[in-house]
């Protein structure tokens, strides 16, 4: 037992468990659904056991529940029913689910969500942080000797900077946990002790692809080869062509394992809004201003959103870079000539605004520059964790000068004090108060490091100081809440769930049902939020609000006005509005809805639900089809006030005979990857299904595959011959089929690859 309790692995585990104490001891869930019930209607109308409503800790992390949690829940629900999660029919009138990439559909840890609601998510988030800590602990075993150094480096990697602020989103920390393991395997291949490192590298690369964080995947694809060749030169004195070829083959098979995810995502990326929206450029590509550098060691210098005193124009969440108050003094006092020193300064150089970084991130580089440059702080975190561990290791060995450590610490303390005087008077008190914490902790660290000679006492104090600092940073930012807050029912959601499907909903305001949250109730909407959704649908969506088709696109599809005919054609039967007399929160759509013939059918406190009595069925026939030669002409047709999408259609392509008679839709059986429609077609007609078009959909008329048309820019259409009885739409994307074949082939190739390595070693 004594040996067990003295194990650094046990201490590392206990530290992480203590940081997650609200979940471990009280079952509170690491998911910010306090924001759901405390800031959004219809939940806001209820107190949920509180006197004045649920207090909201951190609204900046709302994407964790409104996107990532509901996506994971949908994936598990589909798998539970034996349906492969290819398609999400609940947002954007339908959108790819697997191909969206950050849904991480195939990540094995998703299976934890089969556990009871809330508990499974808590385990999922907790294990991600544990995995990050343990992977760094394993990797540091090849670089440092002291157990305390390994524990501290592991804590820095698992808890510093974006590892804390992105913790509850469920993808980034899992992806980051794999990077040290990949580097560890590369080291193992160079040392040549065991062949297992090659297939393990293959497996980890595939797992990284499935983890669902494209930036970390891209960064790994850059730094892993650089690290591999650097370590070869350092260890072997040269680049070994045979070894390099073996590793390249292992990595190639790993990419093949992930092909079932990569190919659909790359295919979808080419048709998405990602390269067209100006989100990243609007925020200067996510580059940090040099004044934000102080947040590397004083996270709350500009305040904190949790305490509602953050006053910087740079988002606390997006630009999170905190390494811990002790890390930079350690790095400066002992800066080795190593790969991680170069990585540390290169990542900082690219993360902060300068002509070179601005030029690089302004380039159209898919998977890299279409997202925020601040994501590179994950690499800063990695390098800092290794460098800090090396510095502490050398501190114990007497190679890190304690005097230099003292002066470097005093330097950062002086910079902090000077910076306070440059803060405007209104906010200076915040910076002064918050900095006092960091300066006090830094003083304790410097005094301990300089004057305590006993190795055991110093090790214990340093571990405690780092644990307290980084644990406080994590606990302050991330909410742990009651499971009862996870998408509870309200009269409004209950009313909508009781209506006969299929139908879609929309809202007049983002304070009504946060984007995508309706997925948790299995309600379908024309709206949605996603950095990766169809560009064609984004343009079409403008017409629902009465805006021009060619307007710019963004990751938000939010109703801004009423275009009744287009909403009806999209099967929008219910629209939620605010029901209040307060001028600042008064409904701006209610009067227009009444004018267009919508009827108020349900009211609960601050929310009124309007219904369209003339809404079109999910599938309907039109008697007139127009033809456009390109998207520009199609856009002009859709913008034409005389165009009526409930009675006619416009498609791109060669004209065909469109003299259609009367037809009837008898029944619709709407499933996730398949839609079956029974029709009565006397003379032949043109059938529209108002689900979003995607090239992966196929259509079968009485069992025979036929042409699927993209209708009105975003919906699906098909010519129905006379005497037809059954129409079936199936989602069968070719990219998924090809990817699956490559993945299975790579899986089969892995043991053959290992066998080949074994035979080569015996020769």
Predicted regions and their residues:
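Membrane-interface coil-to-helix junctions
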Residues: 18-136, 155-177, 270-276, 281-325, ...
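Selective detector of the "anchor" transmembrane alpha-helix that sits immediately C-terminal
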Residues: 116-141, 323-342, 441-446, 737-760
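Contiguous transmembrane helix-bundle modules in multi-pass membrane proteins
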Residues: 9-11, 171, 175-177, 185, ...
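Extracytoplasmic
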Residues: 283, 430-433, 464, 468-661, ...
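Transmembrane-helix signature of polytopic, membrane-embedded enzymes
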Residues: 137-159, 193-196, 342
């Amino acid at each position: 037992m004594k040996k067990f309790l003295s194990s650094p692995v046990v201490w590392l585990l206990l530290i992480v468990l203590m940081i997650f104490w609200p979940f471990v001891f009280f079952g509170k869930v690491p998911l910010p659904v306090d924001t759901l019930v405390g800031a959004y209607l219809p939940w806001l109308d209820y107190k949920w056991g509180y006197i004045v409503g649920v207090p909201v800790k951190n609204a900046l992390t709302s994407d964790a529940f409104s996107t990532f949690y509901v996506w994971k829940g949908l994936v598990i629900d589909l798998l539970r029913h034996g349906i492969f999660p290819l398609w999400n029919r609940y947002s954007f009138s339908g959108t790819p689910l697997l191909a969206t990439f950050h849904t991480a559909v195939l990540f094995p840890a998703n299976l934890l969500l089969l556990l009871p609601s809330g508990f499974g998510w808590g385990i999922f988030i907790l294990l991600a942080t544990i995995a990050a800590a343990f992977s760094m602990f394993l990797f540091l075993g090849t670089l440092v000797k002291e157990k305390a150094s390994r524990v501290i480096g592991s804590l820095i990697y698992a808890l510093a900077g974006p590892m804390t602020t992105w913790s509850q989103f469920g993808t980034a920390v899992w992806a980051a946990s794999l990077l040290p393991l990949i580097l560890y395997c590369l080291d193992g291949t160079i040392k040549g002790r065991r062949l297992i490192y090659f297939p393990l590298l293959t497996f980890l690369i595939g797992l990284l692809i499935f983890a669902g964080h494209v930036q970390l995947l891209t960064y790994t694809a850059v730094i892993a080869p650089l690290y591999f060749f650097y370590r070869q030169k350092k260890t072997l004195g040269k680049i070994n062509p045979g070894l390099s070829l073996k590793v390249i083959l292992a990595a190639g098979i790993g990419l093949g394992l992930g092909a079932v995810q990569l190919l659909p995502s790359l295919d979808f990326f080419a048709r998405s809004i990602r390269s067209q929206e100006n989100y990243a450029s609007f925020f200067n590509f996510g580059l940090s201003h040099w004044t934000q550098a102080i947040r590397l060691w004083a996270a709350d210098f500009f305040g904190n959103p949790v305490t509602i005193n953050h006053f910087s124009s740079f988002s606390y969440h997006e630009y999170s870079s905190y390494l811990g108050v002790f890390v930079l003094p350690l790095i400066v006092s002992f800066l080795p000539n190593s790969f991680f020193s170069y990585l540390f300064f290169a990542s900082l150089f690219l993360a902060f605004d300068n002509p070179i970084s601005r030029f690089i991130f302004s380039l159209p580089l898919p998977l890299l520059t279409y997202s925020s440059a601040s994501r590179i702080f994950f690499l800063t975190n990695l390098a800092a964790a290794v460098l800090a561990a090396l510095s502490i290791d050398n501190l114990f060995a007497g190679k890190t000068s304690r005097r230099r450590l003292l002066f470097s610490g005093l330097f950062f303390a002086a910079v902090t004090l000077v910076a306070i005087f440059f803060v405007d008077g209104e906010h200076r008190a915040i910076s002064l108060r918050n900095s006092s914490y960091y300066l006090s902790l830094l003083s304790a660290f410097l005094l301990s490091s300089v004057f305590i000679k006993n190795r055991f006492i110093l090790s214990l104090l340093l571990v405690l100081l780092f644990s307290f600092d980084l644990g406080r940073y994590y606990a302050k930012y991330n909410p742990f809440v009651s499971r009862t807050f996870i998408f509870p029912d309200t009269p409004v959601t209950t009313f909508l769930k009781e209506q006969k499907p299929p139908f879609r909903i929309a809202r007049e305001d983002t304070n009504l049902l946060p984007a995508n949250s309706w997925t948790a109730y299995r309600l379908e909407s024309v709206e949605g939020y996603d950095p990766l959704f169809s560009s064609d649908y984004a343009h079409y969506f403008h017409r629902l609000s009465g805006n021009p088709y060619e307007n710019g696109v963004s990751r938000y599809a939010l109703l801004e006005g009423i275009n009744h005919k287009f909403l009806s054609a999209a099967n929008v039967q219910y629209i939620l509005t605010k029901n209040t007399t307060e001028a600042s929160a008064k409904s701006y759509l209610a009067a227009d809805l009444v004018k267009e013939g919508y009827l108020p059918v349900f009211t609960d406190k601050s929310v009124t639900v309007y219904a369209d009595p003339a809404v079109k069925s999910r599938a309907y026939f039109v008697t007139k089809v127009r033809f456009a030669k390109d998207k520009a002409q199609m856009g002009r047709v859709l913008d034409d006030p005389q165009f009526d999408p409930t009675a006619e259609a416009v498609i791109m392509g060669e004209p065909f005979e469109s003299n259609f008679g009367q037809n009837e839709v008898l029944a619709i059986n709407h499933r996730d990857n398949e839609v079956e429609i029974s029709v009565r077609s006397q003379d032949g007609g043109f059938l529209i299904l108002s689900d979003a078009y995607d090239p992966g959909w196929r259509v079968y008329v009485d069992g025979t595959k036929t042409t699927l048309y993209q209708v009105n820019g975003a919906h699906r259409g098909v010519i129905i011959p006379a005497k037809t009885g059954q129409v079936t739409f199936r989602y069968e994307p070719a990219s998924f089929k090809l990817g699956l074949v490559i993945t299975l082939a790579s899986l089969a190739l892995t043991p053959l690859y290992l066998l080949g390595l074994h035979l080569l070693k015996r020769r």
